[in-house]
Amino acid sequence: MKSIHLKQLLRFTTASLFTMVLTSSPIFAADNEQVTVFAAASLTNALNEIGQQYEKEHNTKVIFSFASSSTLAKQVANGAPADLFVSANQKWMDYLVDAKAVDVNSRKTLLKNTLVLIAEKNSPITEVVLNGDWDIKAALKGNRMAVGDPDHVPAGQYAKQALENLKLWQAAEPLLARANNVRAALALVEQGEAPLGIVYSTDAKVAQKIKIVGTFPETSYSPIEYPVALVKQESTANAKAFNEYLQGPSAKNVFEKYGFGVN
């Protein structure tokens, strides 16, 4: 009986020591060192690369949630556990400032982008001059043009603004395929569901199945800017450190590689 009791005691002691080692080890600590970033869908490729780079250099896990800026901003306003928010326009950051959900002193315009017209890579459409003479209906041939939903998606709002200024909105509006975010609009063209789409130039840069067939004059839409800010109730040291990293030279190189303008 004593032998059995001794074995049980040894097993308990060994398990306890193992637990103590785990909870005090750097590996365990790393599991608790993380930062959660809510970011516009158009930043997916660039931020994923930056996140991987950051994890290699720091004892911190970076978790991303990518979607339309409008969707994410509403989630943050409702208390979603984000540490950092990066929007594809100033409007949705203003929304969070008004809701007192972000640290206004940490707000900074991080990036810039441009707007392009895309087609599937093998499309017979090669070049479109984007002005008031463009016959959208003829170009679409009974199909629809993919855009982020102008009612709430920044890319769609920029697209609407450009089309309005080029006197094309009235013809275009009934022919739109409205997507939940800019990457969804890109996917519609990639999959052949729409012959044309309006996306950011950075989205076109990472897509292998599409080509740019037109570039919207930058005077036809408001500057496409990406502000970043710390989420107020979650402003941890990890969040502040990653925010600084996003504005540093290593991240800048990645953003530029993906075609973003860096401030």
Model-identified regions with their sequence ranges:
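Bacterial N-terminal signal peptides
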Residues: 11-24
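Exported/periplasmic ABC-transporter solute-binding proteins
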Residues: 29-57, 63-70, 74-80, 87-90, ...
